[in-house]
Swiss-Prot record:
Physiological role: Cell wall formation.
Chain's gene name: murC
Pathway membership: Cell wall biogenesis; peptidoglycan biosynthesis
Statement: the UniProt record of this protein carries the keyword Secreted: no
Highest taxon in the source lineage: Bacteria
Organism of origin: Rhizobium etli (strain ATCC 51251 / DSM 11541 / JCM 21823 / NBRC 15573 / CFN 42)
GO biological process, one term: cell wall organization
Sites where the protein binds ATP: 114-120
Chief location of this protein within or outside the cell: cytoplasm
One term under GO cellular component: cytoplasm
Gene3D superfamilies reported in the protein's UniProt record: Mur ligase, C-terminal domain, Mur-like, catalytic domain, NAD(P)-binding Rossmann-like Domain
Localization annotation: Cytoplasm
Protein name per Swiss-Prot or TrEMBL: UDP-N-acetylmuramate--L-alanine ligase
Amino acid sequence: MKLPKAIGLVHFIGIGGIGMSGIAEVLHNLGHKVQGSDQSDSANVQRLREKGIEVFVGHRAENLGDAEVVVVSTAIRKSNPELIAAREKLLPVVRRAEMLAELMRFRNAIAIGGTHGKTTTTSLVATLLEAGGLDPTVINGGIINAYGTNARMGEGEWMVVEADESDGTFLKLPADVAVITNIDPEHLDHYGNFDAVRAAFRQFVENVPFYGFGVMCLDHPEVQSLVGRIEDRKIITYGENPQADVRFKNVRIDGTRSIFDVEIRRRRTGQRTELKGLVMPMPGRHNISNATAAIAVANRLGISSEDIAKGLASFGGVKRRFTLTGEWNGVQIFDDYGHHPVEIKAVLKAAREACKGRIIAVHQPHRYTRLASLFEEFAACFNDADSILLAPVYAAGEDAIEGVDSTSLVSRIKSGGHRDARFLSSAELLPEMVAEVAKPGDFVVLLGAGSITSWAAALPKQLEGLSGKSA
């Protein structure tokens, strides 16, 4: 049974969230009546309003109006007045993943999972499918620069979605193709232990129907181990690993471009296909790996090598994924969402390969619990940065944990041998501290999932202002 047209007005609590906004937009484009509420008048909220979706700022029971269905994310607390009112009215309350699953039933679906790289990989798969004329519908966890949004309504039979594993609800998604980029011990507050995370990703792949397939990264030990345990589903492996079915090789980094070859081997027939001199306008082996996952999907769906190369070369990137926000005095300033040690290490390694000068990393740790559980990993992930500026922890609603803060992390980084790690006590001091260390040819990379993105946007003009004062 499919989602009927006459479901009435759908109300989203927290509609401005990156996942919720995409689902709301696609529902609206399908002709359903959609409205919602959010705590702030964010860019996502403004974008939805421009499309004709009514959005209330603040959560109040009366916002429900004539709603027949209410959609919530796991971030919405049971004490939310709109949620309480919905239950008093006996309205169906639908989890975000459940509504996404309903949308996926309209299409053949590709779900992109993994601890890191999901958003970029989702964007790359969408780009290659579009280049191949498949006109996909897309719901992503980040703003795709080519679309200016995280959602796209296509006319084709394929849908590409980012599968969020944080609360386990990604297992509800009816995917025909399941991609796993990597598996790390994240979200243990939900899963309890790493074995439960492993089990969830195994189920994610085994949930695909017999006519579907999994695409799995052979470079990641946890994923490689999982490949060996899946017996009854078709699996395509990818990576730099010589044993991968879809392998990238001959990598060259040219500024902020990556140039590489891909070899595709069909295990059953022995057939080989070479894609030579592929160009992607993003640096870094982690991004090449994500592109190779997208190539594996596109190739299996019958997209030509020529269209794959064309799509890859035209890829416009994802907002907050090594996004250039401006330049000052020959210094380039980048904004990145990286907030886990694995992500930070990969971004800084990519910056090191692309930059002719020095790397200045500015990081705002996100959540005390994450910093506490991964403290030693954070202390070791900045080695590719010549200078490190660490801002206070962005709490995201958490209580502080004694002894777990940015000053402690600075001390640990320095005791581990790093030559230049400093505490950045406030955003107001950032321009002066950057101006003190940055020279022409350097990269300044701001990393984090909190408010640091606004610092990255403001920094180029702030630095210009400092130059004006000194003149």
